[in-house]
Amino acid sequence: MKSTENIEKSSIFEKLFKLRENKTTVKTEILAGITTFITMAYIIIVNPNILRFAGMNLPGIKGEGAGAFTALNDPVVASVFAATCLTAAIGTFVMAFYANLPFAQAPGMGLNAFFTYSVCLGLGYTWQQALAAVFISGILFIIITLTSIREKIVDALPQNLKLAISGGIGLFIALIGFKGGGIIVSNKETLVAFGSLTSPSALVTLIGISITAIFMARKIKGSILIGIVITAIVGIPFGITKLAGVKIFSAPPSLAPTFMQFDFAGLLGSGAGKGLFSAIMSVVMVVITFSLVDLFDTIGTLVGTATKAKMLDENGRVKNMNKALMSDALATTAGAIMGTSTVVTYVESTAGVAEGGRTGLTSATVGVLFLASLFFSGLVGIVPTEATAPALVIVGVLMMSSITKIDFEDFTEALPAFLTIAIMPFSYSIANGIAAGIIFYPIVKVATGRYKEVSPIVYVLAGLFIIRFIILP
């Protein structure tokens, strides 16, 4: 009888993923994949819950309160659920078999908020037009990955701005979570205020934040997903979680309501209620924002995780970085086709890497589990906004951690970074935050005679953003 070691040496997994070269085993990789999936599975619940506010549901059932989100009765929301699972599986499989890296992909937190609250609710685009913009950004990402443009853009933006973008998005999605859970409400005199903390919505949300925070502090795997599940259960006696007519197991939902639902004519025409030139400039800004956030989010995750796992090559670069970025670009394009927002490489991949995941077998395992999730669409219908709100707050905390690396001692670096972080939640727009940072960076550098520290690409981007604000005030 062959030993386990000999079996692994001759297995298809060895041939596909070079396990011995990466000093790992089939068992280790599969367990790492399960760990990664558990930590990021919340996205299959949260993503449809955010995109529904962009209008990705049946007319007349948009609602803001508890129980408004019922995937079982809404084929459009169910389609977004299916698109989320399929896109995550496709992107992660490409990462597995093309890049042979242990990183998982799915529609990005922050970018789904940008899609909903900035592009659709803020600029007035329909979700079909927004999906067209995501598709364009995916194609653009493919092109810049095939050329040297990617490296030039990455090198052009200051490191402090890259860190600020992540931190600002964290603050922004935390605000969305607080608002969705009824903890923060609008106020005419003070703009925002505490909601009624004794209301069922706020109580369930606060309990959910506390539970998830405890799990995170104790470093329990799958803390966010477990927190969502427990919070949904807590919501039952409060009347927040509705169980009537729920079927946990079901056939995968149809993609028809969101598949290939692009409106390019509306996007480039009068989709935002502006003239042709203004509409085109608006689209350019939207596409640039989608592309930049996706680019830096993915690169940050890849570099940070690979560094901790000692997966860098002799030049200090992530192995197969270009292939990983191509996986991300292809997944974003596929996601737009199926009906979801921009795909990114998930920072939760670090959980699987910490468990020993070193190859594409880890990500292949994650992909299989996302496909299996298609048969549990009924679970999405159970989970209310109050149960996913804590997840947004906790993810916001994780994303905000990047600001500790910003150089606040240098005012010419601190001001643009601060504006990027602050303006995102205060203007309810990720794009505005990025624009503010990029515009003020060359201003303060030139004012102090340090204009040579600014890349020509940043000057161009700053000019484009200024034009955008003049045309679309």
What residues fall within each predicted segment?
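Membrane-embedded alpha-helical modules
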Residues: L123-P237, T241, A364-P473
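Helix-loop-helix hairpins and the membrane-proximal interhelical loops
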Residues: K2-A78, A193-F194, I228-N322, G463-I467
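Residue-level signature of catalytic and energy-coupling elements of molecular machines
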Residues: I30, I50, I153, G222, ...
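Generic hydrophobic alpha-helical membrane-span motif
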Residues: F53, G108, I228, I233, ...
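Hydrophobic, aromatic-rich alpha-helical transmembrane segments
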Residues: N22-G33, N73-F81, C85, A106, ...
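Transmembrane alpha-helix interface/packing and boundary motifs in multi-pass membrane proteins
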Residues: G91-F103, A213-K219, T289-D297, D328-M338, ...
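Helix-loop-helix junctions within the multi-pass membrane cores of secondary transporters/permeases
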Residues: K9-N47, T87-A88, F97, G108-I169, ...
